[in-house]
Amino acid sequence: MRTVSLFAEWDPKPDFVLGHKDKEGKSTYLGSKVWRNPQIKIVDKDVGEPGPTEVLIEVKACGVCGSDVHMLQTDDDGYIFYPGLTAFPCTLGHEFSGTVVKAGDKAINKRTGKKYDAGEAVCAEEMVWCSYCRPCADGFPNHCESLEEIGFSIDGAYAKYIIVDARYLWSIEGFRALHGEEKMYLLGSLVEPTSVAYNAVIERGGGIRPGENVVILGAGPVGAAACAILKRAGANAVILSEPSESRRKMAMSIGATHVIDPLKENVAERVLEITEGHGAGLILEATGLPSIVWKDVEKIIWEGRAVNTTVVVVARADDRIPLNGEVLQVRRANVVGAQGHSGHGTFPNVISCISSGMDVSPMITKKINLDEVEKNLVALQTDRDEVKITITNFE
């Protein structure tokens, strides 16, 4: 089968220190410090056979993630932008859904409690956690000490087929009755990024009390999905800051109640105006530009009457936050980081939300073939109008 794979050179920056979980020349948790001169190649690979607990899946839809873009995008010295766990060469693609082709005898379907049957529609977690290390045993699989990531450190779903252990799979058969088969798979490919948003605002951010105001900075897929989740959770004002007009309109269709163009308006002042000086109970930083947006974050906290605001940092960025501790102390505010989507009932809760009518499909703004991936990865480095480009043809 044909795959879209990324190759890069292991060439550590002078300040890079090999971590205890890094593997010299193979993998690192600090991708932007090591990998240089990335290239996309179409590579033929064997389909393979699933093991006893594994499932062979025919991929029906796979989203192009901003992380994929940043693994190809480089700085002036040729180093990739993506700062996280990576191992190359690797077939990209982690936001996918598909249908079961074949399953091992011990590959158990969580929906039925029995072995997976061929034809079951599924999506998958991207975080491949071990279940044995201390973080996993403590209930924090997103921080597994032996973590692998589909499409980052092990082969992903920019291919017609993928083999995944059943423990990371979730049935999306519940989408079929409400949405039909084609839309079922499109929505299935959005479960992963929507779960990243859910983990950020509900699990790590602690959720909200119905009637609270929230601010979302950035309307990429995670920011947009957060609008849908928080509106469904009972937020009063869901205020989105996003420079792209098309993204603002899309976000309004799935949950945002107010939108701000940060290129034309002062974000903090507009938030305080919309909330009549109250501010927000939760702020999501989903831009990846904390040094630019943080002044607005602190002004909302400092001048708003709301106490105990939680700021959740979800966008991956090799950038320092210009934090003022006094603002957090006086206003009893919190800053937390969010990574991943595994555990805590996140995937099944997101699937339940979509099954019962939370429609995040407006995020998909373009459908492409496998051959078109590279040019779209390049275009997305500068194009802010597309939200989610999705591969639907893998021939």
Put a short name on every predicted segment:
Residues 180-264, 269:
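Mid-domain Rossmann-like dinucleotide-binding core that forms the NAD(H)/NADP(H) cofactor-binding site
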Residues 46-62, 77-134, 176:
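Glycine-rich beta-strand-centered segment in the early N-terminal region that forms part
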Residues 205-210, 233, 249-334:
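Glycine-rich cofactor phosphate-binding loops and adjacent beta1-alpha1 units
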Residues 83-94, 109-110, 130-213, 217:
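NAD(P)H dinucleotide-binding glycine-rich loop of Rossmann-like/cofactor-binding domains
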Residues 11-61, 83, 87-91:
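A short N-terminal beta-strand-loop micro-motif at the entrance of redox/enzyme domains
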Residues 61, 125, 284-286, 393:
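Short, well-ordered coil/turn residues at beta-beta hairpins
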Residues 17, 284, 294-306, 343-395:
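C-terminal hydrophobic helical "lid"/dimerization subdomain
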